[in-house]
Amino acid sequence: MIPPSGAREDGVDGLPKETASAEQPPSPASTGSQESKLQKLKRSLSFKTKSLRSKSADNFFQRTNSDVKLQADVLAGVSPGSSPLPAPGSLTCTPTRAGLYPGGGGKAHAFQEHIFKKPTFCDVCNHMIVGTNAKHGLRCKACKMSIHHKCMDGLAPQRCMGKLPKGFRRYYSSPLLIHEQFGCIKEVMPIACGNKVDPVYETLRFGTSLAQRTKKSSSGSGSDSPHRTSTSDLVEVPEEADGPGDGYDLRKRSNSVFTYPENGTDDFRDQAKNINHQGPLSKDPLQMNTYVALYKFVPQENEDLEMRPGDMITLLEDSNEDWWKGKIQDRIGFFPANFVQRVHQNEKIFRCVRTFSGCKEQGQITLKENQICVASEEEQDGFIRVLSGKKRGLVPLDVLENI
């Protein structure tokens, strides 16, 4: 049966209306163009991220404005429907040079040509500075930093720390006493203004000397203390019996420190008088302050005392632990404390005539030729016990020469 014409028209009209009401699918050309733009954007961002990671901070902050403009153009080409990205102005804010290098505002090293007379190591490569004829190198005028010529490029991020604090620094001639170039200053000169001395420094120096002298007197033999009757002491020193203040005046006038009295105030006054006069009235105080030189010491300053192995030294002051003041004949000066050996009463001084290698299992020690040692015991079976510095043991008597 053939449907009526009106119904056919409604069905035909209804189909276009249905398709018109539905959404039209996007064309394949427009879809491909959007996907290609997004892929290009992702590639550009990933490429720039990798390049930024591989570069250092300096290269990142020193980029030219053309890179920033290129990035802004790429970001401007993004469709407005995509997710918003940070503005290009936020990426262009770079820190200053001072922020990258906090010490950039410091002083630079003022290096000068220098000839090193002593073994010196480079502060950059830690190798010794050695030249063909002399030890040439560079040294900073302010902080005394020593480097090679070739190590000049390695000091770019460093700055000069300025001059070291003023202090009492000695430059030793023995390799046992060489300190590092920037080691701490162990000795400081007393704070003095005119004739005034810092009371705190004076008190500490006096206490240290008193403790050392007390320990030495207690370790020595009992015959080291003087033996005199109280009558003779009163006759020889009549002005010292007035009161206890006189003993304090004696200690104040003398640089030496006295031991504690064992036999009363008379022995204390007698010992003070002997040390003040520096005379050969008694052998005991002189014997307590007698030392023998173990090694050779070449003076580096005018106040140093030259020593040779075997020289007899009279100790004048030992307030400092490292440097003592002594006298050899008519010469007075300072010398290293570990270069000498104390000589007690009834001790003999020997010099080794040839090298001897001892056996530790048998209590023997090794002595080199011309080495100085001290002995207080008698010979036993051809061996004698000697003391040289920190070494103590048995040595055959035929390798020793009494000096």
UniProtKB/Swiss-Prot annotation:
GO terms for cellular component: cytoplasmic side of plasma membrane; cytosol; sarcolemma. It is found in: Cytoplasm, Cytosol; Cell membrane; Cell membrane, Sarcolemma. GO terms for biological process: positive regulation of cation channel activity; positive regulation of protein localization to plasma membrane; positive regulation of voltage-gated calcium channel activity; skeletal muscle contraction. CDD domains: C1_Stac1 (cd20880), SH3_Stac_1 (cd11833). It is a peripheral membrane protein. A zinc finger (Phorbol-ester/DAG-type) spans 108-160. PROSITE patterns: SH3, ZF_DAG_PE_1, ZF_DAG_PE_2. It comes from the Eukaryota. Residues 286-345, 348-403 form the SH3 domain. Residues 21-36 have a biased composition (Polar residues). Residues 1-43, 212-253 are annotated as: Disordered. The keyword Transferase does not apply. GO terms for molecular function: transmembrane transporter binding; zinc ion binding. Promotes expression of the ion channel CACNA1H at the cell membrane, and thereby contributes to the regulation of channel activity. Plays a minor and redundant role in promoting the expression of calcium channel CACNA1S at the cell membrane, and thereby contributes to increased channel activity. Slows down the inactivation rate of the calcium channel CACNA1C. This is SH3 and cysteine-rich domain-containing protein. It comes from Bos taurus.
